[in-house]
Amino acid sequence: MTPPDKKTAARKAPRKKAAPKGPGREELQFTIDSAWERRTMLTVDEIDGSTRPMVNLVMDRIESGEYRVAEPDGKGGWKVNEWLKKAVLLYFRTQDMELVEADPAPFWDKVPARFRDFDEARFRKLGVRVVPGAIARRGSHLGKDVVLMPSFVNIGAYVGEGTMVDTWATVGSCAQVGKHCHLSGGAGIGGVLEPLQATPTIIEDHCFIGARSEVVEGFVVGHHAHLQPHDG
């Protein structure tokens, strides 16, 4: 048996506090909205001191799926989180051009690759299959069991778990693709950043988008839909 004094000590031992998760949603939104209003007047010190770190934190949370540029409103529709679009646009304003190493030739861009600095452990944790030739940019969310064939997923996009992005398919900036969808070869899911209030292209769960189909910004493809390009 544990002596009484040890039991008392155990009861009184302070619990370890969880590590802080950083600024909350409201603080981030306020910072992003404020920076957006002053975007043409931001100083170097402001960008380095608060704007860029906050924008990068938002990008991290978009990548994790915690934040989405558009999300279900609980009434059968969708709502657009304009402040997240602002964050994506501010990302371009606050990042410097940099050399992106690649083979056979490097790139010169502001947006790094989603998988830059990944190793085997990080790929296994993410749970996404990435075929050679696939490109996903920083700030894109990829759910578990997503398969990326040689395709392109842009910044701010959301691709739900179990979805196949087939060869030469494109998921545009801030587009939202649901779970267990199939974007066939050459399909294009349009991207939209401006105007801010515009609804991104949305593909709901369990959809099949046929080869060479194009779904432009503002359209919502309902769940379990099957689209083929018009041949007439």
Task: Say what each PLM segment does.
Residues 124, 128-232:
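Structural signal for interior beta-strand "rungs" in well-ordered beta-sheet cores
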Residues 1-128:
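Terminal amphipathic alpha-helical/low-complexity segments used for targeting or macromolecular assembly
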